[in-house]
Amino acid sequence: MSQAKSNKMGVVQLTILTMVNMMGSGIIMLPTKLAEVGTISIISWLVTAVGSMALAWAFAKCGMFSRKSGGMGGYAEYAFGKSGNFMANYTYGVSLLIANVAIAISAVGYGTELLGASLSPVQIGLATIGVLWICTVANFGGARITGQISSITVWGVIIPVVGLCIIGWFWFSPTLYVDSWNPHHAPFFSAVGSSIAMTLWAFLGLESACANTDVVENPERNVPIAVLGGTLGAAVIYIVSTNVIAGIVPNMELANSTAPFGLAFAQMFTPEVGKVIMALMVMSCCGSLLGWQFTIAQVFKSSSDEGYFPKIFSRVTKVDAPVQGMLTIVIIQSGLALMTISPSLNSQFNVLVNLAVVTNIIPYILSMAALVIIQKVANVPPSKAKVANFVAFVGAMYSFYALYSSGEEAMLYGSIVTFLGWTLYGLVSPRFELKNKHG
């Protein structure tokens, strides 16, 4: 028993894992993407920060009162039965599968900029597969090893970003910031809306503590703390750092950069310092991917334990690592990386990001809707339940706004992926629906 507990994550490791899942993949390219819109994107930040905190608070409540295992799938089951559990885990798993390939591609792109290398599309695809496999194999040591490695690599993002938040003000130009407000003169709501998907991509990961509930010490207490702490910490760092950098680097240079933080430090100090920052960013990106690869294996394992996914995802080693499932996942991702080989890596990256955001929002909406009944079952006093239900409603409304802002193409493909899930559930439904009827 004590040995099993020793391989579980504590609250600090889980909070760091939640933060690194958001920060590592999200913030690296964010200043470049937001510069395409202008500094008016600070309004998008505030909207997304409020929406994300509402989601995080509601997830914390779900974590406190839910008595079902499996993270978001367990929450959804309260309101939508076994089909809701399946759909939450299926769409979340698909989202992570897509997002992890996008993260790996961005790590390769950042690394080539650091080394001054020029890779062909095929070489980029092969390098992406290499990154995916390295980050998968590093997870074979179990939950505690993953937490320890992530807690080291997160500093690759925290040091330069927090450093920029503190010392960047000495190079900050208010005039430059104001001139970059809305460079393309887009209508207000159009400009704010076009930044929403970008900012939410940065926050994806606020639910990762929920996905890892089965490998956490004292989940009732630790999951809510980790979700809220990780989200709040990331929100402050995001908003300050991306707005400081917009007052240091001219808008056009920032929009055309492939390594915005490296560019900022190169302008503040020397090109060599910029290279060091880029190296730290590559390290943090790989650490983020490491955390996500562990999370997706855990999501697939939870679904397999429930009987939704094939049994191969449930098999674990002596250190509780679902190695066979991890290998299956990375093989699928390798195929996806080969399929995405394209002369325009950036456009392919954006398609992957938007599709990942859309599919990730589905389990968010299911979880928000389920909080009402979760609290009723837990006999939460009506006055307290009303507050949490209202916050969950705000989180759901933000989720729908984010879906709308993701664009028609992402919504189309995301819908097809989601509807396919209902068909797949039909194939496994007899083992659940017949049991319910005869039970």
Swiss-Prot record:
Effect after changing residue 210 to A: Moderate decrease in both uptake and excretion activities
GO biological process, one term: putrescine transport
pH dependence: Optimum pH is 6.5 for uptake activity. Optimum pH is 9.2 for antiporter activity.
Ranges per topology, Periplasmic: 31-39, 112-113, 173-185, 246-275, 342-353, 408-409
Primary localisation category: membrane
Annotated localization: Cell inner membrane
Reported effect, residue 62 to S: Moderate decrease in both uptake and excretion activities
Consequence of changing residue 422 to L: Uptake activity decreases more than excretion activity
GO cellular component: plasma membrane
Transmembrane spans: 10-30, 40-60, 91-111, 114-134, 152-172, 186-206, 225-245, 276-296, 321-341, 354-374, 387-407, 410-430
Consequence of changing residue 292 to F/L/Y: Strong decrease in both uptake and excretion activities
Statement: the UniProt record of this protein carries the keyword Cytoplasm: no
Substitution effect: residue 285 to A: Moderate decrease in both uptake and excretion activities
Cytoplasmic compartment spans: 1-9, 61-90, 135-151, 207-224, 297-320, 375-386, 431-439
Reported induction: Induced at low environmental pH. Part of the speFL-speF-potE operon.
Keyword Disulfide bond appears in the UniProt entry: no
Outcome after substituting residue 433 to A/D/N/Q: Strong decrease in both uptake and excretion activities
Bilayer topology: Multi-pass membrane protein
Annotated phenotype, changing residue 90 to L: Uptake activity decreases more than excretion activity
Catalytic activity: putrescine(in) + H(+)(in) = putrescine(out) + H(+)(out); putrescine(in) + L-ornithine(out) = putrescine(out) + L-ornithine(in)
Regulation: Uptake activity, but not antiporter activity, is inhibited by CCCP and N-ethylmaleimide (NEM). Uptake of putrescine is inhibited by high concentrations of ornithine.
Family to which the UniProt record says this protein belongs: Belongs to the amino acid-polyamine-organocation (APC) superfamily. Basic amino acid/polyamine antiporter (APA) (TC 2.A.3.2) family.
Subunit details: Monomer.
Function (record text): Catalyzes both the uptake and excretion of putrescine. The uptake of putrescine is dependent on the membrane potential and the excretion involves putrescine-ornithine antiporter activity.
UniProt protein name: Putrescine transporter PotE
Provenance organism: Escherichia coli (strain K12)
